[in-house]
């Protein structure tokens, strides 16, 4: 669904899916099991003011089952990132500081690791340019010696709730700034690059 206001267009998608993995999906996941459950939520906010950046977040959970319907594997994935049309250094610092604060609550290596994955993933290879200024990206986050599945759930919930701390203060500063027709034209070009990434490189849309 889409909600629209004078300030922005907000695209939200949430879903729960049951089914059987395709052969290519089984090969990609390197599993012999095919029964699965997946759920997730995706949020994209496109401000109408070119001085305000695009916000994107995606959070998901995946389970695999054997023939007796026992869970044999489960993991979390997702992230959030920022795509400005015009760079304000303070906004970038603020967004990443919130990302780092959340990560540091769980593991001091998370921010560096997940930021690097975000920079690598959200890259328009055919133009050799970044889609935005990054954020966090993580996937296949399974229970391990330092993080239980409940810990991963708490981490993902914090990422989801971070919209209020990471993004809203930026919008409050930028949504009423003056802009020109030239600024709007540049915004359209950068939105076009955003669409290019989604159509050419985004694995969640390609597969």
Give the predicted meaning of each segment.
Residues 9-61:
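Long, hydrophobic/aromatic-enriched structural stretches that serve as scaffold segments
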Residues 101-155, 166-172:
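Long, charged, mostly alpha-helical binding arms that flank functional sites
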Residues 1-7, 11, 207:
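Single conserved hydrophobic/aromatic residue that forms the stacking wall/gate
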Residues 66-113:
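Compact, glycine/acidic-enriched structural inserts
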Residues 16-18, 42-49, 61-63, 84-86, ...:
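Short, flexible loop/turn elements at secondary-structure junctions
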Residues 145-204:
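Extended, compositionally biased non-globular segments
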Residues 37-40, 73-83, 129-150, 194-196:
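Glycine-rich, often proline-containing surface loops adjacent to acidic residues and nearby aromatics
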């Amino acid at each position: 669904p889409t909600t629209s206001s004078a300030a922005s267009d907000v695209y939200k998608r949430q879903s729960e899916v049951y089914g059987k993995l395709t052969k290519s999906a089984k090969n990609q996941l390197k599993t012999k099991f095919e029964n699965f459950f997946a759920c997730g939520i995706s949020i994209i906010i496109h401000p109408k003011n070119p001085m305000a950046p695009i916000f994107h977040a995606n959070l998901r959970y995946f389970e695999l089952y054997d023939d007796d319907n026992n869970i044999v594997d489960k993991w979390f994935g997702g992230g959030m990132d920022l795509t400005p049309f015009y760079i304000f250094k303070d906004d970038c610092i603020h967004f990443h500081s919130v990302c780092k604060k959340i990560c540091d609550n769980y593991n001091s290596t998370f921010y560096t690791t997940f930021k690097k994955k975000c920079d690598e993933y959200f890259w328009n290879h055919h133009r050799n340019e970044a889609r935005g200024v990054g954020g966090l990206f993580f996937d296949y986050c399974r229970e391990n010696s330092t993080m239980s599945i409940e810990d991963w759930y708490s981490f993902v919930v914090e990422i989801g709730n971070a919209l209020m701390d990471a993004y809203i203060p930026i919008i409050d500063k930028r949504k009423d700034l003056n802009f020109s027709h030239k600024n709007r034209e540049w915004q359209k070009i950068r939105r076009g690059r955003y669409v290019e990434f989604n159509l050419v490189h985004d694995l969640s849309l390609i597969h």
